[in-house]
UniProtKB/Swiss-Prot annotation:
GO cellular component, one term: cytosol
Cofactor details (free text): Binds 1 [2Fe-2S] cluster per subunit.
Gene Ontology molecular function: 2 iron, 2 sulfur cluster binding; DNA-binding transcription factor activity; double-stranded DNA binding; iron ion binding
Protein name: HTH-type transcriptional repressor NsrR
Cofactor(s) named in the record: [2Fe-2S] cluster
InterPro entries reported for this sequence: TR_Rrf2-type_CS (IPR030489), Tscrpt_reg_Rrf2 (IPR000944), Tscrpt_rep_HTH_NsrR (IPR023761), WH-like_DNA-bd_sf (IPR036388), WH_DNA-bd_sf (IPR036390)
Record lineage: Bacteria, Pseudomonadati, Pseudomonadota, Gammaproteobacteria, Enterobacterales
Record keywords, A-Z: 2Fe-2S, DNA-binding, Iron, Iron-sulfur, Metal-binding, Repressor, Transcription, Transcription regulation
Gene name as annotated: nsrR
Described purpose of this protein according to its UniProt entry: Nitric oxide-sensitive repressor of genes involved in protecting the cell against nitrosative stress. May require iron for activity.
Binding site for [2Fe-2S] cluster: 91, 96, 102
Length: 141
């Protein structure tokens, strides 16, 4: 299973915000510059993360974006559930005539649940705290 670029960059944006000194705001432009992703794509990602409460956007001259929760309260599995379309196969009888007898969807569903359960063991804080090599790569001080 490969995560979509939407989820990938959503996680990266959260990692960047969690790496900043506490309380420091950033901008969508800053995040796009760090990762080299289109601004339009990042705006959509940040909007969804904001609707889910993972990011807070502050308007105005001194505005920007920052984490909406503490990094230790953001489970990676929850973020993936929010951003990632997790249906691995299209099992409607319109597309597949073996749907009534097929057990593949159930097997894939169990595999996805195991994947997400493992990701639930990690918070955003686990990925960024005391990670000096990450801070250097992100040019965060």
């Amino acid at each position: 299973m490969q995560l979509t670029s939407f989820t990938d960059y959503g996680l990266r944006a959260l990692i960047y915000m969690a790496s900043l000194p506490e309380g420091r705001m950033t901008s969508i432009s800053e995040v796009t510059d760090v990762y080299g992703v289109s601004r339009n794509h990042m705006v959509k990602i940040i909007n969804q993360l904001s609707r889910a409460g993972y990011v807070t956007a502050v308007r105005g001259k001194n505005g920007g974006i920052r984490l909406g929760k503490s990094a230790s309260a953001i489970r990676i599995g929850d973020v993936v559930r929010e951003l990632e379309p997790l249906s691995l196969v299209n099992c409607s009888s319109e597309f597949c005539h073996i749907t009534p007898a097929c057990r593949l969807k159930q097997a894939l569903s169990k595999a996805v649940q195991s994947f997400l359960t493992e990701l639930d063991n990690y918070t955003l804080a686990d990925l960024v705290e005391e990670n000096q090599p990450l801070y250097k790569l992100l040019l965060v001080e």
